[in-house]
């Protein structure tokens, strides 16, 4: 059977659009905090990825605007992000969208501007079970967690990021049809108590931290061994308390 190039392009667009993802909300110590979209999540108008590394959308996605609420936590709590596609019970993201996951923190007063983003968590390719972070996110029903660090009490932005590499064989700046896809979501979080707090160090800017020459931005997952992949810097902060990709709760049981 023969297919026209136009038809294949259309099919590719439809498949791509059906694969996009956003953060629905968060859980704290296994307790669902409810639908956070435009409430405590700075939600973009749709689930399209960001691809332009120089765009201000690299900060907290499109329309980085303050939303009315913030989720209260304490240092040492487990904060879990829950991603979704269109509805909470559908596929999280296409299985073809292999890539890493990271979580950053910044003071909310900065609105994410400047050298303020500090990496708390990173997971890319697991050589033990030969899976990408996104593969395990799908298995975990869209949930991954980070432990709230011991920083000064106050308001913060937690920036969850997925980098989908299925079209990262080319750079967006050279071929806008392709390029790595960034799924970004910022949650407004208030840390109420923290013993022995450690000041956040200087961080990196978004946009600015990633460039065309940054490791992990251009990578051909089809021809290059996944074991050679290096996630984009910066490295995880020494004061970070870790995280994981695992399901902590089942929304269908609520």
Swiss-Prot record:
Residues with Methylhistidine modification: 20
Subcellular location: Secreted
Residue ranges crossing the lipid bilayer per the database entry: none
Signal peptide coordinates: 1-19
Amino acids binding Cu(2+): 20, 97, 183
EC code: 1.14.99.56
GO-annotated biological processes: cellulose catabolic process
EC supergroup of this enzyme: oxidoreductase
Free-text biotechnology note from the record: Lignocellulose is the most abundant polymeric composite on Earth and is a recalcitrant but promising renewable substrate for industrial biotechnology applications. Together with cellobiose dehydrogenases (CDHs) an enzymatic system capable of oxidative cellulose cleavage is formed, which increases the efficiency of cellulases and put LPMOs at focus of biofuel research.
Cellular compartments per GO CC: extracellular region
Pfam families: AA9 (PF03443)
Binding site for (1,4-beta-D-glucosyl)n: 28, 66-67, 77, 86, 148, 159
Keyword Secreted applies: yes
Activity regulation, per record: The polyphenol cinnamtannin B1 contained in methanolic extract of Cinnamomum cassia (cinnamon) acts as an inhibitor of catalytic activity.
The record's account of how the chain is modified after translation: The catalytically essential N-terminal histidine His-20 is post-translationally modified by methylation to prevent protonation of the histidine side chain, and protect the critical active site of the enzyme from oxidative damage.
Residues that, per the record, bind O2: 166, 181
GO molecular function: metal ion binding; monooxygenase activity
PANTHER family: ENDO-BETA-1,4-GLUCANASE D, PUTATIVE (AFU_ORTHOLOGUE AFUA_1G12560)-RELATED
Family as reported in the entry's similarity comment: Belongs to the polysaccharide monooxygenase AA9 family.
Function of the molecule: Lytic polysaccharide monooxygenase (LPMO) that depolymerizes crystalline and amorphous polysaccharides via the oxidation of scissile alpha- or beta-(1-4)-glycosidic bonds, yielding C1 or C4 oxidation product. Catalysis by LPMOs requires the reduction of the active-site copper from Cu(II) to Cu(I) by a reducing agent and H(2)O(2) or O(2) as a cosubstrate. Is able to cleave phosphoric acid swollen cellulose (PASC) in the presence of a reducing agent, yielding a range of cellooligosaccharides dominated by cellobiose and cellotriose.
Protein name per its UniProtKB record: AA9 family lytic polysaccharide monooxygenase A
The organism of origin for this protein: Panus similis
């Amino acid at each position: 059977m023969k297919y026209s190039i136009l038809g294949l392009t259309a099919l590719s667009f439809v498949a791509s659009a059906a694969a996009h993802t956003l953060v629905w909300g968060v859980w704290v110590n296994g307790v669902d905090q409810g639908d956070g979209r435009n409430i405590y999540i700075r939600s973009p108008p749709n689930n399209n990825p960001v691809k332009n590394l120089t765009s201000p959308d690299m900060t907290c996605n499109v329309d980085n605007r303050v939303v009315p609420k913030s989720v209260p936590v304490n240092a040492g709590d487990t904060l879990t992000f829950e991603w979704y596609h269109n509805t909470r019970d559908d596929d999280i993201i296409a299985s073809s969208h292999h890539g890493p996951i990271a979580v950053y923190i910044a003071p909310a007063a900065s609105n994410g501007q400047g050298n303020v983003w500090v990496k708390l968590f990173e997971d890319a390719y697991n050589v033990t079970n030969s899976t990408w972070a996104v593969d395990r996110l799908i298995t975990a029903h869209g949930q991954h967690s980070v432990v709230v660090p011991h920083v000064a009490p106050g308001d913060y932005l937690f920036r969850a990021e997925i980098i989908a590499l299925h079209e990262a064989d080319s750079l967006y700046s050279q071929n806008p049809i392709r390029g790595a896809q960034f799924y970004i979501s910022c949650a407004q979080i208030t840390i109420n108590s923290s013993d022995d707090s450690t000041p956040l160090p200087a961080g990196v800017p978004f946009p600015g931290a990633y460039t065309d020459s940054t490791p992990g931005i251009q990578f051909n997952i089809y021809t290059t061994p996944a074991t050679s992949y290096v996630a984009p810097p910066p490295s995880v902060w020494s004061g970070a308390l870790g995280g994981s990709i695992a399901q902590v709760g089942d929304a269908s049981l609520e």
